């Protein structure tokens, strides 16, 4: 809200940085908490479900934000509404007697656990892959509307609807379906198929335009859906018993989301083509496919 009054780009960047810090703290605390709220054997199922519900926010966010930001409404209103909603949720949670997750950890410490070393090279490759995924996803999300306006020739408000119901809707459905499919098929193979899908879809986005590119974007979001939790879990398998340290390091890879948009924006400004900028996500998906292909089945 102060940023809308000051009307400074750098103040808006600072505001977004503060929001990002809050979201990072929420992500790092909510995911471990979800693992201890219930039977330990169902921990992975709970995390997948909680991450799948992110898709609902990704649908509502672009829908509401696009309609407000591109309709001439004061830019402070969307952020004020989000702030009020978050404060309301925080107030509700503060009144709920939530179980203490430390009790579960205390119970675990009474059992002897065999120390297993971290496979540093394999885990490092997993970190790099997750870094590139976050970079690709953020780049695609950041420039979808710009690309749609330039190459698909649709208005920004219409593009925001396509992003909300088409892209994010398929992302949500894909993550739910992927959680079920992985009960029958190795996660590595599911990741490989999705990497191939996203690579081909991004290639179409680069070389084509119009309706075909829009369809490719939808396929791209569908393929992206299972990547983050799958890469995260595969990388953790190389962490041995250093899962807490490994989880913290993996969370740090979200900084990739700050890298790709800058590079893609520079390419678009330099070449005058938003489509060429999507070569960056194309390379990222290629590396993800290589990671899934070369990942030893024995480590799954």
Regions found by a protein language model. Give the residues of each.
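Helix-to-loop junctions at the C-terminal end of transmembrane segments
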Residues: 174-186, 268
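Extracytoplasmic gate region of multi-pass secondary transporters
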Residues: 119-165, 169
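A gly/Pro-rich, aromatic-decorated transmembrane alpha-helix motif that marks the paired
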Residues: 29, 50-71, 247-249, 255-274, ...
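Helix-loop-helix hairpin linking two adjacent transmembrane segments in secondary transporters
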Residues: 46-101
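C-terminal ends and interior cores of transmembrane alpha-helices
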Residues: 1-6, 196-209
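Cytoplasmic helix-loop-helix junction between adjacent transmembrane helices
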Residues: 15-52
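Hydrophobic core of transmembrane alpha-helices in multi-pass small-molecule transporters
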Residues: 9-26, 212-227
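Intracellular juxtamembrane helix-capping segments at the cytosolic ends
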Residues: 25-39, 225-240
């Amino acid at each position: 809200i102060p940023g809308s009054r000051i009307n400074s780009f750098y103040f808006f960047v600072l505001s977004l940085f503060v929001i990002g810090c809050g979201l990072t703290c929420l992500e790092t605390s909510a995911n471990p908490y979800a693992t201890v709220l219930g039977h330990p054997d169902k921990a992975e199922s709970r995390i997948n479900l909680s991450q799948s519900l992110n898709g609902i926010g990704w649908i509502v966010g672009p829908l509401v934000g696009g309609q407000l930001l591109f309709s001439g409404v004061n830019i402070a209103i969307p952020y004020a509404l989000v702030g009020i909603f978050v404060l309301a949720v925080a107030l509700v949670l503060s009144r709920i007697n939530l179980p203490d997750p430390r009790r579960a950890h205390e119970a675990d410490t009474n059992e002897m656990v065999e120390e297993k070393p971290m496979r540093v090279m394999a885990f490092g490759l997993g970190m790099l892959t997750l870094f590139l995924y976050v970079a690709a996803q953020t780049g695609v999300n950041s420039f979808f509307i710009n690309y749609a306006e330039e190459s698909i020739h649709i208005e920004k408000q219409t593009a925001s609807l396509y992003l909300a119901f088409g892209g994010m809707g398929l992302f949500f459905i894909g993550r739910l379906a992927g959680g079920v499919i992985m009960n029958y098929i190795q996660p590595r193979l599911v990741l490989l198929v999705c990497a191939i899908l996203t690579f081909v879809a991004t290639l179409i986005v680069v070389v084509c335009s119009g309706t075909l590119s829009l369809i490719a974007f939808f396929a791209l979001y569908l393929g992206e859906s299972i990547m983050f939790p799958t890469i995260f879990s595969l990388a953790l398998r190389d962490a041995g018993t250093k899962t807490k340290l490994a989880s913290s390091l993996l969370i740090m890879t979200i900084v990739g989301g700050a890298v790709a948009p800058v590079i893609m924006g520079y390419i678009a400004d330099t070449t005058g083509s938003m489509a060429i900028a999507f070569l960056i996500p194309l390379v990222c998906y290629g590396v993800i496919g290589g990671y899934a292909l070369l990942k030893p089945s024995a480590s799954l």
